[in-house]
Amino acid sequence: MTTYAVGDLQGCLEPLTCLLERVDFSPSRDCLWLAGDLVNRGPQSLEALRFVRDLESSAITVLGNHDLHLLAVAHNIERMRKSDTLQAILDAPDRADLIDWLRQQKLIHYDAERHTAMVHAGIPPQWSLEKALRRAAEVEQALQDDALLLPFLDGMYGNQPAKWNKELHGVPRLRLITNYFTRMRFCKADGTLDLDAKEGADSAPAGYAPWFSHASRKTRNVKLIFGHWAALEGQCDEPNVFALDTGCVWGNAMTLMNLDSGEMHRCECEHGKPA
C-alpha cells in the first residue's frame, strides 16, 4: 500500500487521473489524500467530486474554501459568482448525495502513524496540533448537524475577527476557525490574520509572515501537507511542510506526492487539462 497526497483539484480531474495512472494507483491497494478545494474554476467540478466520493475509504479529503462555498450555494445561502463552475453539481441528479457527502468531510486529517497532518490552508502558529484538531471539530460539528448548518453557512463569510480570543463564541468563533484552516496565508505570530495579501511568500505585509515560517509555531514537530496557496509554486522552504497546490487551474501544474518516499510527480496543465 502506498499513500499519495495531491493539492487543489478545483474541478481539474484529467490531470489527477493522469498522475494516478503514472504511479499505477489502485484504490484496492493505495490511498489518496486530497488537500481540499475539490471543485470550482476548473472544467470538471462535478466529475471531480464524484470521482473522490466514489473512491470511498481509499480517499481522505479535507475541506477547502471553495468546497465550503459550494455548500453555501447549494443551501441558498450564497449566490454563484461569475468565476464559479458549480452549476453542473447543482443540476446533477445525485446533487443531494454529493452535498451530503461533502459536509461530512473534515477540516484537518491527522495520521498518527506518520505523524502527518493535512489541512487546506494551514494551522495558525499559536495552536498545537491537539488544539487545532479540537477547533476543527467545532466546525465539523456545525457542518454535520442539521440544526447548526444553515446558521454557520450564513455567517461563514467575512474577514473578522482577525485574531483568536478564547472568549470568542458562536458564529464569529467558527468563522475565524474556518478562515485559519481554509483561507490563511499570512499572519502574525499570535495568529492575527491578513486575508488580503495573496501573492508569494515574499509579499508579506509589514509585521506579517507566512503562517508556516514563524519560529514560535507549535506544530514544528509535525509533518504538514497543505494546498490553497498556488502562488508559492510548491516552495515553502520549511522542513516538514509541503505546499502541494501548484496552480493547475491557473495553467501551471498539478502535484502528487508519495508520502512514503517523498517523491513528487507533476502534470503540467493548460485550461485545467494535461498540457
Curated annotation (Swiss-Prot):
Keywords of this entry: Hydrolase
Reaction(s) the record says it catalyses: P(1),P(4)-bis(5'-adenosyl) tetraphosphate + H2O = 2 ADP + 2 H(+)
NCBIfam families according to UniProt: apaH (TIGR00668), PRK00166.1 (NF001204)
A Gene Ontology molecular function term of the record: bis(5'-nucleosyl)-tetraphosphatase (symmetrical) activity
InterPro entries linked: ApaH, Calcineurin-like_PHP_ApaH, Metallo-depent_PP-like
Function: Hydrolyzes diadenosine 5',5'''-P1,P4-tetraphosphate to yield ADP.
Protein name as catalogued: Bis(5'-nucleosyl)-tetraphosphatase, symmetrical
Protein family according to the UniProt entry: Belongs to the Ap4A hydrolase family.
Record HAMAP family: ApaH (MF_00199)
Enzyme Commission number(s): 3.6.1.41
Record-linked Pfam families: Metallophos
